[in-house]
Amino acid sequence: MAVEKFETALKKLEDVVKKLEGGELSLEESLKAFEEGVKFSAFCSKKLNEAERRVETLVKQRDGSFVTKPFEGEE
């Protein structure tokens, strides 16, 4: 799988899902598409986790200055 961009992988994952939902694939084709989809899903998940680690929040201090802190998302 030579995907470098999140958006590309997400589009390919959406295409795989549409194929699987269409019900037109043989069992073997469905299994192959499913395996491909799992790879795209893992890639997207990895990229989202990397992005989340890079996000920071801007916090205003009492003196009016600003500092950045790591983003603490919902978990």
From Swiss-Prot:
GO terms for MF: exodeoxyribonuclease VII activity
Q: Which major enzyme category is it?
A: hydrolase
Q: Where in the cell is it found?
A: Cytoplasm
Per UniProt, which keywords does this protein have? Cytoplasm, Exonuclease, Hydrolase, Nuclease
| This enzyme's EC code(s) | 3.1.11.6
One GO BP: DNA catabolic process
* Cellular component annotations (GO), alphabetically ordered: cytosol; exodeoxyribonuclease VII complex
Catalysed reaction(s) here are:
Exonucleolytic cleavage in either 5'- to 3'- or 3'- to 5'-direction to yield nucleoside 5'-phosphates
- Record InterPro entries: Exonuc_VII_S, Exonuc_VII_ssu_sf
Superkingdom classification of source: Bacteria
User: Which family is it part of?
Assistant: Belongs to the XseB family.
PANTHER family, alphabetically? Answer: EXODEOXYRIBONUCLEASE 7 SMALL SUBUNIT (PTHR34137:SF1)
Q: What does this protein do?
A: Bidirectionally degrades single-stranded DNA into large acid-insoluble oligonucleotides, which are then degraded further into small acid-soluble oligonucleotides.
Recorded protein name is Exodeoxyribonuclease 7 small subunit
Query: What's the name of its gene?
Result: xseB
